[in-house]
């Protein structure tokens, strides 16, 4: 305890105060010793002042370290301060666990004195901040890893990605779409003229059948539809004279829709 550190003794009986005062006077050149009874320790308002706290070491003290006092000890100890607590033999593990939960570090049972547990406060204060120093060489290596060597990179021409069919311009007729559906298919009630245009293109591409040698099997075709059968090639045409040459339409036997 060099440099006259502040030490706090916590005892359970007032009878132990006198003996500890004699100890304090003998070591006054080494430490500032203060003695408190356990009933009064909760009233202490000294703040983080003590470098070490010894609890339950009075000669006539039969009271073990009160676990409920540990949070108070953390407020009285300075950063890195030491708590030496005495408890009943066999209950050291419970004290070790409670001290760890209160934030003490390096908590361990004494190997020389049974029933004694020692722990240290962290070297930092709650809410304190510290500067984090980064390795500049590591940062430079990370940046250089993403640099590209232009000499080794291969570029692909955009024209090489196109096929021969991609270079052909589409016909304007194939781009015609319905004003309603925006598709190259006429809607049911098409009024934009796409249906008529598609029908005209279909009829244009449909080969016309040869009807020059068409003959009637019943002999009544020239009389009109009233005398024609259901499969008559002249169905729907006006009556004509017998033997007259009639040119049939190219959409014969095809649906009107």
Curated annotation (Swiss-Prot):
A GO-annotated cellular component: mitochondrial intermembrane space
Main location: cytoplasm
GO molecular function: 2 iron, 2 sulfur cluster binding; 4 iron, 4 sulfur cluster binding; electron transfer activity; metal ion binding
Compartments where located: Cytoplasm; Mitochondrion intermembrane space
Pfam families in UniProt: CIAPIN1 (PF05093)
Region: Linker, residue numbers: 135-168
Binding site for [2Fe-2S] cluster: 178, 187, 190, 192
InterPro entries with a match to the protein in the record: Anamorsin, CIAPIN1, SAM-dependent_MTases_sf
GO biological-process terms attached to the record: iron-sulfur cluster assembly
Annotated segments matching region N-terminal SAM-like domain: 1-134
Signal sequence residues: none
HAMAP family, per the entry: Anamorsin
Quaternary structure note: Monomer.
Identification of the protein by name: Anamorsin homolog
Originating organism: Acyrthosiphon pisum (Pea aphid)
């Amino acid at each position: 305890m060099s440099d006259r550190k502040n030490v706090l003794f916590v005892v359970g009986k007032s009878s132990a105060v006198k003996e500890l005062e004699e100890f304090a006077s003998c070591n006054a050149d080494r430490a500032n010793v203060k003695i408190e009874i356990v009933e009064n320790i909760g009233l202490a308002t000294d703040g983080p002042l003590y470098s070490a706290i010894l609890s339950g070491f009075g000669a006539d003290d039969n009271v073990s370290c009160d676990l409920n006092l540990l949070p108070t000890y953390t407020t009285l100890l300075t950063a890195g301060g030491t708590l030496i607590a005495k408890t009943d033999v066999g209950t050291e593990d419970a004290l070790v666990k409670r001290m760890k939960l209160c934030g003490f570090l390096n908590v361990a049972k004494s190997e020389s004195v049974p029933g004694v547990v020692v722990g240290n406060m962290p070297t930092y204060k709650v809410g304190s901040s510290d500067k984090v120093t980064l390795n500049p060489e590591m940062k430079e290596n990370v940046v250089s890893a993403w640099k590209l060597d232009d000499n080794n990179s291969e570029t692909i021409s955009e024209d090489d990605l196109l096929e021969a069919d991609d270079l052909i311009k589409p016909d304007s007729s194939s781009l015609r779409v319905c004003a309603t559906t925006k598709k190259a298919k006429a809607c049911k009630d098409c009024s934009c003229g796409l249906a008529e245009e598609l029908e005209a293109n279909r009829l244009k591409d449909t080969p016309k059948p040869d009807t020059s040698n068409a003959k009637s099997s019943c002999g009544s075709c020239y009389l009109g539809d009233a005398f024609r059968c259901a499969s008559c090639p002249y169905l729907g045409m006006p009556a004509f004279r017998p033997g007259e040459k009639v040119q049939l339409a190219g959409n014969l036997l095809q649906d009107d829709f």
